[in-house]
Amino acid sequence: MRFFLLLCFFLPCFQAINLGLKVLELCTTGSCISQSASCVTGDIVNVTQVDRTHVVMCADFRHIKYTDVGRTFRIKFSDVTCSWENTSPADVVFPGNHILQFTVLGVCFDNKVVGGCQNINEPCPEPHTVFHLQREDITLLELCVQAAGFNAQDVGVKYDFSLRHKNCLRYKRTLPPHEVVDEDY
C-alpha cells in the first residue's frame, strides 16, 4: 500500500505541462469576431494581447507541479512550427508570431491523499493578465499570462500543446461555426 501511495504522489513529477486552448472570440477596437462554441473543460479567460486586442478562450492547463511555481514558459508557434523555452517574467512579448508566455504564480491541490499550496508573491507586469483556474484536484492555479499574434483566423480553432516535446504543438483543429459542444477537448 505504501508503494502505491508513493507512486501516486511522485508519478505527476514525470509528466510535462500540457495546455489546451480554444479561441472563442477576438475583439479589436469596437468590433468582435466570435464563435458559439463552449468550454467543455477548462476555464473561460480573457487575455489582453500586447497590441491591446482581447482574446477570449478556453484555457486548460494540466500537470502543473509545485516545482513549476516561479517558472516562466514561452510558447511560440505557427501552423508548421512550435517551440518553447524557459524565460523571465520581465521578458517582453512583441506583436507578430503567435506567442503565449505564462508564469506560474501559485498552485494548490488536494488529491484526497496529500494536498497543500505553493506560491510566490510577485506582481504581474502591467500588460499581463492574471488567471485563476481550477481543474480536478487542483483547487487553485494562478498564472500571469501574456499573449501576441492571435487574430481573426484563430477564432474557432483548438490548439493542444505539450511541453514534453520541443516541437510542442500536438494538434490544431478548426471547429465548425455551429459546433456548441465538442467531446474531445
Curated annotation (Swiss-Prot):
| UniProt-recorded name of the protein | Non-structural protein 7a
Stretch forming the signal peptide: 1-16
Which Gene Ontology terms describe the biological processes this protein takes part in? symbiont-mediated perturbation of host cell cycle G0/G1 transition checkpoint; symbiont-mediated perturbation of host cell cycle progression
**Do the record's keywords include Signal?**
yes
- Superkingdom, taxonomy of origin: Viruses
Keywords on record: G0/G1 host cell cycle checkpoint dysregulation by virus, Host-virus interaction, Modulation of host cell cycle by virus, Signal
Q: What is the protein's species of origin? A: Bat coronavirus HKU9
